[in-house]
């Protein structure tokens, strides 16, 4: 049997319990077709980069699968039919990773607090310029412009 990593996105308006029910449903499909599901991770509700089927957020779920290709095809067929699944992707892998996935360790942009120093870091000073005084941006009067050559 081949090893796969499978990720799917579920609609934002279903509950976390319904997402768990979807995972169990697809786990049952894999096991009914002679496969095994190892690690299951629910990454929670995350913002999408762009809208998918009028959704701005989605529930993400990851499954490590050890199954024959026919089981994967049947699971993907049922996902295409389901209105709750926005997208899915199955990738064949050499071996499953140990420990939590990188996405589980990564925090969503919405979960982060404010950055230190506001939007920008501290202002840098350059060695060849005098230090700027905040609020006073005048550097003296500008010299007169030279006449343009095309109008002379």
Swiss-Prot record:
SUPFAM superfamilies: Ribosomal protein S6 (SSF54995)
A Pfam family annotated for this UniProt entry: Ribosomal_S6
Gene Ontology molecular function, alphabetical: small ribosomal subunit rRNA binding; structural constituent of ribosome
Gene3D superfamilies named among the record's database cross-references: 3.30.70.60
Example GO biological process: translation
Region (Disordered) residue spans: 96-152
Domain of life: Bacteria
One CC-aspect GO term: cytosolic small ribosomal subunit
Keywords noted in UniProt: Ribonucleoprotein, Ribosomal protein, RNA-binding, rRNA-binding
InterPro entries on file: Ribosomal_bS6 (IPR000529), Ribosomal_bS6_sf (IPR035980), Ribosomal_S6_plastid/chlpt (IPR020814), Transl_elong_EF1B/ribsomal_bS6 (IPR014717)
Function: Binds together with bS18 to 16S ribosomal RNA.
NCBIfam families named in the record: S6 (TIGR00166)
Family: Belongs to the bacterial ribosomal protein bS6 family.
Annotated protein name in UniProt: Small ribosomal subunit protein bS6
Organism of provenance: Rhizobium etli (strain ATCC 51251 / DSM 11541 / JCM 21823 / NBRC 15573 / CFN 42)
Gene: rpsF
């Amino acid at each position: 049997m081949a090893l796969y990593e499978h990720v799917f996105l579920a609609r934002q308006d279903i509950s976390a319990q319904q997402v768990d029910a979807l995972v169990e449903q697809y786990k049952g499909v894999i096991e009914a077709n002679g496969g095994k599901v190892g690690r299951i991770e629910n990454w929670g509700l995350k913002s999408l980069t762009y809208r998918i089927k009028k959704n701005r957020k989605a529930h993400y779920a990851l499954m490590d699968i050890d199954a024959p290709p026919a089981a994967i095809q049947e699971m993907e067929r049922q996902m295409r039919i389901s209105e709750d699944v926005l997208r899915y992707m199955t990738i064949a892998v050499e071996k499953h990773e140990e420990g939590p996935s990188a996405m589980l360790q990564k925090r969503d942009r919405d979960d982060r607090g404010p950055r230190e120093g506001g939007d920008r870091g501290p202002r840098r000073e350059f060695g060849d310029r005098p230090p700027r005084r905040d609020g006073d941006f005048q550097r003296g009067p500008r010299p007169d412009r030279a006449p343009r050559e095309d109008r002379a």
